[in-house]
Amino acid sequence: MPRVACIANPNARDGKLGKNFHKIEEALGSSGIEYDVFMTEGTGHAIEIASGLRDSDYDLVVAIGGDGTVHEVANGIRGSSKRLGIIPMGNGDDFARAIGIPLKDIQGAIDLLNGGSDYTVGGIRVEGLRAPEHPGIPSPKHYPVTGDPSKEGNLVRWSFLECDGGVTSSINRMKDEGHFSWISGQKKYTFLAIKAILTWKSQMAWIKVDDQPGHKVDLTGLFALMQAETFGGGYRVAPGMHPFGDSASIVLGFGLSKSQMLRVMGPLEKGKHVGRWGKISKDSCRSFEIRALDPEGNPTDEEGHDPPLFISLDGEISMTTPVRFEFHEGQLHVRGGPSPPNRR
C-alpha cells in the first residue's frame, strides 16, 4: 500500500469538505492506505505544504479539494519526483476529470491512489503582475518553488488545467466573493457566467500567439489557454483536448456581443462553439502574450489595464496584465484512471 500525504482544503465546495472530512478519513482507513493529513489555512498554503514534501518519503502527495487546491499542490511539487494524486471535492474538478479520476465517488478516487495509472503532463509557466488585494482576498504571494520572475514585482505560477481572462475571470472573482454559494457544480458556474456577462464592460488589449504578429482585440468574449477539454465544471471549452500532448490549445472568441455570449453558453457546454459567427477559434499554442494599450493605443509592458484585467490560472485569480504564458512538456507526475478522456 502507498504512503500518502493528503493536503486538504476545508473550504472546498463552499466549506462542505471541512464538515464532511471524516467520511474521507474513514474511506482512507478502510482502504488500508497509510496517510497523513495537512489542512490548509488559506490561499497559497497548499503550495507551502507541498513544496516542503518534495524530498519526503511519501509515495503520493494527494490534493483533496477542487481545481484550486490541485493547482497549489501541483505548483509545490512540479519538477520533482513526487507524484500527484487527487480526491476531487470541488465545484469544478476539471483536472481530475481530465486524468480519468471519477467525480462524486470518494471510494473510486481512493482506489486509484493504490491501483491507478501513472502519467506525466506538461505545464504552462505564467508570469505577470500579481493581482492586487481585494476585500477579503489577499494579493498572491511569491513562492521560490515556482521559479524567479524576470521582472521585479511580477509573479510566477504554473498552470496545469487552463488559463483565462476577461469575462471568465470575472466569474472566478465572483466565485471567490461567495456569489451563489448555495449552488454547486456546473450549475454554479452557469449562474456566475450569466451575471458576469451582463455586468461586463469592454476592454481593449494586444495579444500575440506563438510567432504570429501581435494584434489588438476587443476582450468582450473569451480567451482560454487549455490543457484539458473542460473547465467550469464540465464546459467543453477545448473539444478533444487532453493534458498529455506537446502543446496547449488556445480558444479565442473576441468582439462578441452580450447576446452572443449568452447564446454561446449552450454550445460551449457541448463543445459546439468553435467556428460560431466566424469569431471563435481553437488552435494549438505554446506561447501567448497579452498586454494593455497605452494612451496612444500601443501595447505596453510597463503597466496593466485600468481597471485591472484579471487572469485566472486553474480557476484561481493570480495576475493582471501584462502576462506571458509558455508551455513546457514533462512538468508534473500524476496518478489517474486507466482511460482518461481523449487520450489516444
Give residue spans per PLM region.
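ATP/NTP phosphate-donor binding region
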Residues: 1-61, 71, 341
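Glycine-rich beta-alpha junction loops
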Residues: 10, 128-130, 163-167, 227-230, ...
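Glycine-rich beta-strand-to-loop/alpha-helix junction loops that act as flexible
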Residues: 10, 64-66, 87-90
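ATP/nucleoside-binding phosphotransfer catalytic cores, i.e., glycine-rich phosphate-binding loops
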Residues: 17, 209-212, 236-237, 242-243, ...
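Catalytic core of DAGKc-family lipid kinases
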Residues: 31, 79-83, 87-222
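Short Gly/Thr/Asp-enriched flexible loops that form oxyanion-binding sites at enzyme active sites
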Residues: 69-82
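Glycine-rich phosphate/pyrophosphate-binding beta-alpha loops
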Residues: 164, 168, 224-238, 317
